[in-house]
Regions:
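Metal-associated gating/positioning segment near the N- to mid-region
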Residues: 40-111
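Active-site glycine- and acidic-residue-rich loops that bind
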Residues: 130-141, 225-229, 234, 242-244, ...
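Hydrophobic faces of well-ordered beta-strands that scaffold small-molecule active sites
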Residues: 48-52, 90-92, 126-130, 153-159, ...
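Histidine-rich, glycine-flanked metal-binding segment
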Residues: 1-6, 11-46
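C-terminal cap of metal-dependent C-N hydrolases
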Residues: 10, 324-326, 330-331, 340-380
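Metal-coordinating catalytic core of metallo-dependent amide/deamination hydrolases
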Residues: 97-226
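Glycine-enriched alpha-helix->loop->beta-strand junction motifs that scaffold or abut catalytic
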Residues: 149-153, 235-242, 257-263, 287-291
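His/Asp/Glu-enriched, well-ordered alpha-helical/loop segment
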Residues: 260-268, 272-353
Length: 380
């Protein structure tokens, strides 16, 4: 059941900036007026967050290594965390990888089946992204069928093979631990990696065919961890128009020059830079080289990152919040959300103006999270 409410007294972040005019919702949409009055003085109402890439849901599916929960129950728990952090639309980034375990094809099937089973019972709008390892050429047919069967609308291409070590005939770092963690013999794991590495010459031709097939089906495509302008240009030629977490300013600038969307990690902003020496998200924001921020592995970072960028003067609040709302919605082609304009989905979050803690989250006009004084006022 959707709410019919008229919020008064709060600061409201609309497309033109903050104001104190009332905000009404009804029928799952932002409306021009009407609804039961709710005084939210002392709070700020912001567009609901759109998380364009996050794998933080994984820990709800396996709280401890090897301790798999019921997938559906785990996704319900993940939604609770999303809602508590003001996220109204979330893209679950699921691997389809030779790495096995929670990144393997079998687990990807379980996640998609679990999502299909609980989606109708959730308030947060959940979408799936498939992270495809380009080296798995022999799986491309199965991957295309998987994408079609599960109606996946967003695919990102990755390559996590340690090519430098494999080319030099060295044993990749941490190989034994990684293999044992997924129940695979380390020597067989190494042999598989070597076989995939040796078959990389097959990737360009096969990837061209796969990307063309996905493009015809209307699938949005992106690449992960671009390191150079050349790499970004190559991905653009294949129709992968999203640069997800480019590792260098050069790659990001190439994306901007080519009209591609740039996604960076919100934890990178919260930390003040990359944890592994890659491009700094705050610097990229200052240069105008970010279209959307993603939670990556930490859902609370989205809200914190937007406020940090505004506090640092790199954006005003409207510009900073755009990176976690309208920006990612636009990249995903979700034109019905991301701002608090009449006619848009009633996706919003309410934060305490003093502490900036989330007090309420509403997705599609339905409450997904409610706490404290805001709860007392809405219920009352």
């Amino acid at each position: 059941m959707t709410l019919s409410l008229r919020f008064t007294g709060a600061e409201v972040l609309r497309p033109g900036g903050l104001d104190r005019a009332p905000l009404s919702i009804a029928g799952g949409k932002i409306r021009d007026g009407g609804g039961r009055n709710v005084d939210l003085s002392g709070f700020i109402i912001l567009p609901g967050i759109v998380d364009i890439h996050g794998d933080g849901f994984e820990r709800h599916l396996a709280p401890r290594r090897g301790a798999m929960k019921d997938i559906g129950a785990g996704l319900v728990a993940a939604e609770a965390e999303l809602a508590a952090n003001g996220i109204t639309t979330a893209v679950l980034a699921q691997f389809y990888s030779w790495e096995g375990g929670m990144r393997g094809p079998e687990f990807a099937h379980l996640v998609m089946e679990g999502l299909a089973g609980v989606r109708a019972d959730l308030v947060t709008d959940l979408h799936a992204q498939l992270r495809v390892e380009t080296s798995m050429v022999d799986h491309y047919g199965a991957i295309a069928a998987f994408i079609t069967a599960h109606r996946i609308g967003y695919v990102v291409f990755n390559d996590h093979l340690p090519h430098e070590a494999l080319e030099a005939g060295k044993r990749p770092a941490r190989l034994t631990g990684q293999a044992l963690r997924i129940g695979r013999n380390p020597e067989k794991h190494l042999a598989m990696m070597q076989t995939l590495h040796e078959g990389m010459h097959r990737v360009p031709g096969a990837l061209g065919k796969l990307s063309a097939q996905l493009a015809r089906a209307g699938v949005i495509m992106g690449s992960h961890d671009d390191r150079s302008a050349c790499a970004r240009d190559r991905w653009r030629s294949l129709g992968a128009r999203i640069a997800e977490f480019p590792e260098t300013v050069e790659a990001a600038e190439a994306a901007r020059a080519g009209g591609d969307a740039i996604v960076m990690g919100a934890p990178n902003v919260v930390r003040g830079g990359s944890h592994n020496g890659n491009a700094s998200a705050p610097d990229m924001a200052a240069m105008g080289l970010i279209d959307a921020l993603a939670s990556d592995y930490h859902y609370p970072s989205l809200r914190r990152a937007a406020f940090l960028l505004a506090d640092a003067g790199l954006h005003d609040l409207a510009g900073a919040w755009h990176l976690v709302s309208k920006g990612p919605a636009t990249v995903l082609g979700l034109a019905d959300r991301g701002d608090l304009a009449p006619g848009q989905r009633a996706d919003l979050m309410v934060v305490d103006s003093r502490t900036r803690r989330v007090a309420a989250t509403i997705s599609g006009g339905r409450i997904s999270y409610l706490a404290g004084a805001a709860a007392a006022r809405m219920i009352g």
